[in-house]
């Protein structure tokens, strides 16, 4: 660009022209301009002819002379005509699109992230087109790769990458003609992170080079709404804003939900986090408009298709449905059908068709009096059902975690009943109350029988739990007042009156004295938590307690305070029914499961609170049962695995209702001299007179069947010195089963683990299985 000169840069003007400037266009007319142009053209022709001579050489002032047609000129021309080539061997253009210079926008489609980058997780691969096919295609309709954001793909572990890919294929209809799936991974495998990855990917990209969905809804228990918000913020680092529905007035809630539902695109908060209860109340608003996808956390809440929450969620206008549950099957096939039908309606037909085709045949084959033909038909129908649901269910066990977490030791401790407990227990079994309960039962347990079972469980824990029944001379305790000591005081806990409490008291004292380990105490009854509190105050232990009475907001603060290493809280008292799911208690590395639940899923959920991501110490899990009592019967029910298929699990919160009269007779039996009723029924071939002569197979661990664990009738060989010392001191332990997890292989962080082993093929099991899934053990487990 020409720049005008400043006055100081110009030379002196002539006097006569100082004030007589005339524009050039006015000095020359049109004719003179034409003449000047012709003159210039003539000079150019003469200049060119003067440069040529007879030898066709160019005269240059340089000393070099060469011909225009020389080999050198041709070589230079060939080099200049060569197309540009990327100086990398075997390089393939990343997106295959054309590039244009300047400000004009390229119309060819490109994926959001590089599919050939290191550690890239590609969920969709477009068809491979030849160059000839590309020439005839509309560039605006070419499909592109769907690539997970590197922010997430670089931290996903191998099994999590597989889970994200599986869910994407399901919701996009790549696995049949359905768009739903069930993520049935066990606790601690990162189901939340996998769902965050799926939602973020669908909100930002798709094969059509545009977002697949505009908004999503995450439905969870009210205690986990805040946790979901934290997870989105943690993994996406604030890149996505969520709309959590917790608290607030009714007017504000309605306004927020209407704005979320009515906005179709460019929504500031495209993810709604809402509890099951709130969704049911405001379902009319949320079901008016379409939504891209719905995720249901703790999805086993939808096992009853007749409840209002299930029906409200079924009315949601979306085809993409993801259900999260570590325990997708908790009772029978009807509940299992409800879950599958929620994510993929009509996959299994109507309820009547499903019952006729599958349920009736399978249940007939499970009866003890079924014929061989009925059992074979049941097996065939079970395999047919598995083949159908395999395409929409993925399940991995926490066996995968063993390579990332410190070692875990699990121990099932059989504690003897004290003399007072023993007398109360046997007197109640011999009472007219139990005799009438058994007489009233014909095919199923009566309500009185179920109440008697609860009474026996309380006797096993501590006499304080039935003190009111004793003083009131309740049925079964008419003559039990003399059993208690004369100075008995229910308000002042005496651990010596209970074998389990005596053992717990000894072990807590040893743990407190030997180091800085923290402990989680879990029970199914809040009354037992009250006894824990009395013990903690008696021994002056710092503690926190979480049960159903605690508000949702306060729970998070309590957990954070306990996990703080500087906190003086030694004990965390937890009700398994109130807070067994979603809690991360890695501040502790020792956990006592004080009483067993009929549903093994509840116990597994609760016991997984300490052995999870972030844990740095070896973990010790203690499961306490009273020797020979109903608690051992419950343990046996938990470990029982039906012979037909691991798809059908015999575990339910109200499993007692399915007991036959013969089952109840077995529950109301007791042998005071037995070391372990469970070990006797195993008919263990590795033990002689309750002494282990042969160790378990090398390839077993704490996920194996109890018959494949270590069996100890004394304190030698125990993995925990504290338990070994308590066995000697309190002399209330009769038998111990113990095993450990596989040794930790990867000490690196999750990010490093994911990047170091991208090629690993994790253990993948699509169909749900029992917690103890060693098929070879069933042959020895004859008594169950």
Curated annotation (Swiss-Prot):
Q: Which GO terms describe its cellular component?
A: nucleus
Q: Which GO terms describe its biological process?
A: cell division; chromatin remodeling; DNA synthesis involved in double-strand break repair via homologous recombination; double-strand break repair via homologous recombination; double-strand break repair via synthesis-dependent strand annealing; meiotic DNA repair synthesis; oocyte fate determination; oogenesis
Bias (Basic and acidic residues): 36-47
Instruction: Answer whether the UniProt record assigns the keyword DNA damage to this protein.
Output: yes
Where are stretches of biased composition, namely Acidic residues? 775-784
Q: Fetch the PROSITE patterns from UniProt.
A: HELICASE_ATP_BIND_1, HELICASE_CTER
Q: Where is this motif: DEGH box?
A: 297-300
What Enzyme Commission number(s) appear in the record? 3.6.4.-
- Phosphothreonine PTM positions read 22
Binding residue positions for ATP: 185-192
| Region annotation Required for chromatin remodeling, strand pairing activities and coupling of ATPase activity: where it falls in the sequence | 2-9
Q: Which SMART domains does the annotation name?
A: DEXDc, HELICc
Q: Which domain of life is it from?
A: Eukaryota
GO MF, one example: DNA translocase activity
Q: What does this protein do?
A: Involved in mitotic DNA repair and meiotic recombination. Functions in the recombinational DNA repair pathway. Essential for interhomolog gene conversion (GC), but may have a less important role in intersister GC than spn-A/Rad51. In the presence of DNA, spn-A/Rad51 enhances the ATPase activity of okr/Rad54.
Q: How does it assemble?
A: Interacts (via N-terminus) with spn-A/Rad51.
Q: Which family does it belong to?
A: Belongs to the SNF2/RAD54 helicase family.
Please identify the protein, giving its name as recorded: DNA repair and recombination protein RAD54-like
What is the native source organism of this protein?
Drosophila erecta
